[in-house]
A protein has these predicted regions:
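Rossmann-like AdoMet
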Residues: 1-56, 76
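The AdoMet/dcAdoMet-binding core of the Class I SAM-like
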Residues: 38-169
Length: 169
């Protein structure tokens, strides 16, 4: 066990584990992510960024930092003037990415194109005229609130409509 953190809003404990070269983050008895398996994170970023990679100043929002794999793939897909904004609800996850997890994805949050906000991604989506070219939601391992019930809103018709309004044409 490398670290623990409380999830804002419900107080559920997140735990960061390491075994040999493998890391995992768990909430309760659920494994949220593991450094062995990150294909879905890569696929999410590739799918979103390939369609906008030709835009010289693409601006994307990623909900959930995780272990940094989505951010790394977005950076690899986008140009040198792109902006990658990350909303991470749990400050300790950001700290873990600076310390224990930094090398897993090649220190993506140290890239000058990245700005990390320790905030609920829903708040970032609700900002009028967010001006994002893509929004990637990688929270709660899917469309049902696993760590936070309020995350159900993100994948509701209202949440998706709000996200759509935050996109550039």
């Amino acid at each position: 066990l490398l670290g623990t953190a409380q999830t804002p809003g419900n107080g559920e404990e997140l735990r960061l584990y390491q075994r040999d070269n493998e890391f995992s983050i768990k909430a309760g008895r659920h494994e949220l992510m593991n450094s062995r398996i990150y294909g879905s994170e890569d696929a999410l970023a590739k799918l979103a960024c390939q369609k906008i990679s030709a835009r010289p100043q693409a601006r994307v929002l990623i909900g959930g930092l995780g272990m940094g794999y989505t951010v790394r793939t977005a950076l690899d897909e986008l140009g040198p003037k792109a902006q990658v904004i990350v909303a991470e609800l749990v400050p300790a996850v950001v700290d873990w990415n600076r310390e224990f997890l930094a090398e897993l994805a090649g220190r993506p949050i140290d890239d000058q194109r990245v700005k990390v906000h320790e905030v609920d991604v829903a708040q970032m989506i609700k900002i009028p005229d967010g001006g994002y070219d893509a929004i990637m939601l990688d929270v709660d391992n899917g469309p049902e609130g696993l760590t936070l019930k309020r995350n159900d809103w993100l994948y509701s018709l209202k949440g998706l409509s709000t996200a759509c309004d935050a996109l550039r044409p």
